[in-house]
Amino acid sequence: MPKTIAFKHDTVLLHETVDMLEVKPNGIYVDATLGGAGHSEYLLSKLTTGHLYSFDQDETAHANAKVRLSEQLAEDKVTLIKSNFRNLKSALAELDITKIDGILYDLGVSSPQFDDSQRGFSYKKEARLDMRMDQSQTLSAYEVVNDYPYEALVRIFFRYGEDKFSKQIARKIEQSRKIKPIETTIELADLIKSALPQKELKKKGHPAKRIFQAIRIEVNDELGAAEESIEQAIDLLKVDGRISVITFHSLEDRLTKSIFKEYSTVNVPKGLPMLPKEMEAKLKLINRKPVLASEEELEFNNRAHSAKLRVAQKQRD
């Protein structure tokens, strides 16, 4: 049985993310990233006859939500969906939901997944290399580290970790795994350190952070899934419906910003006196600059330091 005690989780940008959706009490809403259920719980407090659909592929998140949201589940105000959010449209269609009033995303790995040492997400805690958000999938960090060719590792480390020492780290991994498989998080973290110049080790922040991020993104296809899901969400939104997206690193933020820009920009032909409705932008940006955590939140929630919130509103189908 999945543990619920593991899900001690301080929800980032809780009020901002939900409040900016301008929740209608009778609306249909989606929490694409259930996690610790903080956003879901707060959004549910704003619903009367409305309904919330909460997605997560992590069984532990569902076990926790069944306890935390037990009252709302009993009242049939929320439906928990165990699925990757890239299946957003098809999963909702199975429930006869084709349009929604709003949706929120809290991207990346959740704090409880980091905190559970057995999940293999953390470079600070000894565990078998894993990093799977969905424990039923076959590809894990172990396979990426031990089976991917040198060139693929370099590409992943550079693209998803933006690490300038990608080649050196990939070469060190390649040499080490010829002797014996790299099995644990600490083993990998120590290997990464050994590949770096001494001056890099003295810099602020853990030297393995970027590489662990890159492997995690590869294992879970995080950016591919996010892009697919956000585009599906825009299509699902009713006119005037809103989408809130919290990101935690530059790759997620650039992706979100790029999608929002694509859907909120119109190239108007010269000499056109009036823009036809079908040529209007699908989205309107609610905030051009991302919303950041307040000083008050930063005092008790360290994870909020890198959080950025972007919100947009549907203008036309």
UniProtKB/Swiss-Prot annotation:
Protein name in the entry: Ribosomal RNA small subunit methyltransferase H
Domain of life: Bacteria
EC number: 2.1.1.199
Binding, S-adenosyl-L-methionine: 37-39, 56, 85, 106, 113
Primary localisation category: cytoplasm
Keyword S-adenosyl-L-methionine part of the UniProt annotation: yes
SUPFAM superfamilies: Putative methyltransferase TM0872, insert domain, S-adenosyl-L-methionine-dependent methyltransferases
The keyword Cytoplasm is annotated on this UniProt entry: yes
Gene name in the database record: rsmH
Gene3D superfamilies assigned: Putative methyltransferase TM0872, insert domain (1.10.150.170), Vaccinia Virus protein VP39 (3.40.50.150)
Catalytic reactions on record: cytidine(1402) in 16S rRNA + S-adenosyl-L-methionine = N(4)-methylcytidine(1402) in 16S rRNA + S-adenosyl-L-homocysteine + H(+)
Family named by the database record: Belongs to the methyltransferase superfamily. RsmH family.
InterPro entries xrefs: RsmH (IPR002903), SAM-dep_MeTrfase_MraW_recog (IPR023397), SAM-dependent_MTases_sf (IPR029063)
GO cellular component: cytoplasm
MF terms (GO), sorted A to Z: rRNA (cytosine-N4-)-methyltransferase activity
Record key words, sorted: Cytoplasm, Methyltransferase, rRNA processing, S-adenosyl-L-methionine, Transferase
Described purpose of this protein according to its UniProt entry: Specifically methylates the N4 position of cytidine in position 1402 (C1402) of 16S rRNA.
GO BP: any one term: rRNA base methylation
Compartments it resides in: Cytoplasm
